[in-house]
Design a protein with these regions (language model features):
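Alpha/beta enzyme core
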Residues: 2-36, 48-68, 72-190, 198-227
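Short hydrophobic "strand-cap" motifs at the C-terminus of beta-strands
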Residues: 193
Length: 227
């Protein structure tokens, strides 16, 4: 793919999900996102009101996480988290799938968990569309499981499938991103996240089929000129 680092900014979710992230860290993240015109900032729910205020006059979206990082919250809690995040100003939701239900073969429960979050975005009292990304945590899945999870997530109505939380045993891998893209086709986005540190690594993910990158190294990626 022929793209310059600075042109990649619109595909990057500039991320700080560190449990030790401070108010100043989030202010810095938002300032960087505004400067480089990233797609969004991806932050923990506690900081959504702050980010929404800091970014209200620009195109950068506020993205937060639901059921993070294990995906083991009840569906009711995930639905509440989603509505609460949107009430506080979130415009994109990255939810962690119910990995245990999926691994147990409880596929109806698995699907309904995802669909409940999608439905919660439509009843949160906002007029704009809320983007939902489902985190598969691919480090715990084999190829057939990745494919099946993608198929079910697509059928549940998500906007993106996403590789990783960044808290698992490994992050995005080229082969997983490629499989995810082949499975969901062009109707659903693919977000690669976890372990993407520079422009070349981000470009590899785009070449594999990703159209969104989640990274804490967004500034490095978009300023990584090789000319």
């Amino acid at each position: 793919m022929a793209i310059k680092p600075k042109d990649m900014a619109k595909m990057i979710d500039h991320t700080n999900l560190n449990p030790t992230a401070t108010v100043d860290d989030i202010k810095k993240l938002c300032a960087e996102a505004k400067e480089h015109e990233f797609a969004s900032v991806c932050i923990n729910p506690i900081y959504v009101p702050l980010a929404a205020k800091l970014l209200e006059e620009c195109s950068v979206k506020v993205c937060t996480v639901v059921g993070f990082p294990l995906g083991a919250n009840t569906t009711e809690v995930k639905s509440y988290e989603t509505r609460n995040a949107i009430k506080n100003g979130a415009q994109e939701i990255d939810m962690v799938m119910n990995i245990g239900a999926f691994k147990s073969g409880a596929l109806e429960i698995f699907k309904s968990d995802i669909k409940a979050v999608v439905d919660a975005t439509k009843t949160a009292g906002v007029t704009s569309d809320i983007i939902v990304k489902v985190i598969l945590e691919t480090c715990y899945l084999d190829e057939e499981e990745i494919k099946q999870a993608c198929e079910i997530a697509k059928d549940a109505g998500v906007d993106f499938v996403k590789t990783s939380t960044g808290f698992g045993s490994h992050g995005a891998r080229i082969e997983d991103v490629s499989l995810m893209r082949k499975t969901v086709g062009r109707d659903v986005g693919v977000k690669a996240s976890g372990g993407i540190h520079n422009f070349e690594e981000a470009l590899d993910m785009l070449d594999a089929g990703a159209n969104r990158i989640g990274a804490s190294s967004g500034v490095t990626i978009v300023t990584d000129e090789k000319d």
